[in-house]
Amino acid sequence: VQYYNTGDKDSTNLIAYASDLSMFAMLFTDMQNGTRDYGNDRPIKSVEVAILSTIEQNPGITVSDLSQKQHRTKGTISSIVSNLEKGGYIYREKRPGNAKVVHLYTTPDGERLNTLYIAFVTKKTAEIQSELLKVCSISEMNSFCKVLHEYVKLLSKAFDEES
């Protein structure tokens, strides 16, 4: 099946593309919202541990900055941050001279969970890549990644314009 516009008047290809893209988005969203134990015997949502990972990579990040980086509303980020704090994975800190702005940091438990998460994602990505290489060439996979990267940029721009 060709998923790009070949110039003919038949829109079937574009409908197939839109259908697959919608299904991919739904399945990926379900996966992100699912709860999983990454190896610390404390199940957590994938989206929460992804936010935790961003906090560890950006010590002192604020909810506003996290919201922009993750293209999510401040309310959504605040809710996730509260869950991470309740779980003992992060802590909040105000800096002297600016009691309004709260900075976020990972705890040792948060750092351990992030290490487990990165190991899980690395293993899962390798497994998926191995399966895809059975039916796709490396060139096709690279093309998909390029298109996906550009698609993310378009969606991010649209999100930023709506915010």
Residue ranges and their predicted role:
Residues 18-25, 48, 52, 107, ...:
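Generic structural concept
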Residues 83-142:
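Charged, amphipathic alpha-helical coiled-coil/dimerization segments
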Residues 24, 28-35, 70, 110-132, ...:
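Alpha-helical linker/hinge and terminal dimerization helices associated
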Residues 32-73:
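N-terminal helix-turn-helix DNA-binding core of bacterial DNA-binding proteins
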Residues 1-43, 112:
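N-terminal leader segment of winged-helix/HTH proteins
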Residues 1-13, 138-163:
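C-terminal regulatory/oligomerization modules of transcriptional regulators
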